[in-house]
Amino acid sequence: MELKQLITFITAAEHVNFTLTAKMLNYAQSSVTSQIKSLEEEIGTPLFERLGKRLILTEAGKTFKSYAQKIIALTEEAKMATNQVRETTGTLKIGATESQCTYRLPPIIKEFKQAFPQVKLIFKPYISNEQAKEQLLQGQLDITFILDVNRMEDALHVESLIQDEIKMVAANDHPFPADLPVTLKDLQNETLLLTEDGCSYRTLFENNLHDSGIYPNKLEFVSIEAIKQCVMAGLGIGILPEMTVKDDIAAGRMKELNWQSDCPVFTQLAWHKDKWMSAPLKAFIDLTRKTFK
């Protein structure tokens, strides 16, 4: 028993005319006759009585009509319920760094969860932008936040949200004055506290150092919070996004050195160009745009 057979039967039962039914449903009349015959064979009793050219709904047909209407109504209700669940549940796998999860995303997450409480959010850290982009290409992430320069990507949609300043910070008692410019040459004998290899702003900064023939000592950390603690302990100079250190600078826990990055980086949102946009994913993107803009 197929849904289309039930729809054909209901239409025929309401108009008691196979020719009109065929015209209304865009079927050949033979198709209508065949569908009704299949139903009658499956049920085991005639649904229509044919008296010459007249078509009469049998008592069995009248009884079956009420059930057929219920089946069709329940089918539509099931479709609507399923679509509603599909649109408001599920899982979003989001790539983000520690600093983005800590300083950028909490207000977005809060508002999103209020709108989509049944959608599960999984935030996955990554070592480098290239790793995050590869995970998008492989379908391991639905969307990712990256911190990078503006560049074109063949298979990805990359949208810059906000420019991020990169700051050079040191302990308050570091000998570098806060008001005098710091040059790359000044860093030759310093210890730099850096994020993991593959971080976009670290790569840009180190390229500038190497182009100038400067190779300072360096300590590498997985955690930005660890770098900040080491900066405040006087273990070296940190190169970090402004969002991660502005509160510490304002509170006097460390000082900003007079240095300007010559290559702007941006918080960006990226996803595969062929990614199917579910309602939760589209809402997350729209909310992120609204928050940053």
UniProtKB/Swiss-Prot annotation:
Residues 18-37 bind DNA. Residues 1-58 form the HTH lysR-type domain. Keywords: Cytoplasm, DNA-binding, Transcription, Transcription regulation. One of its GO terms (molecular function) is DNA-binding transcription factor activity. It comes from the Bacteria. InterPro entries: LysR_subst-bd (IPR005119), Tscrpt_reg_HTH_LysR (IPR000847), WH-like_DNA-bd_sf (IPR036388), WH_DNA-bd_sf (IPR036390). Belongs to the LysR transcriptional regulatory family. This is Uncharacterized HTH-type transcriptional regulator YwqM.
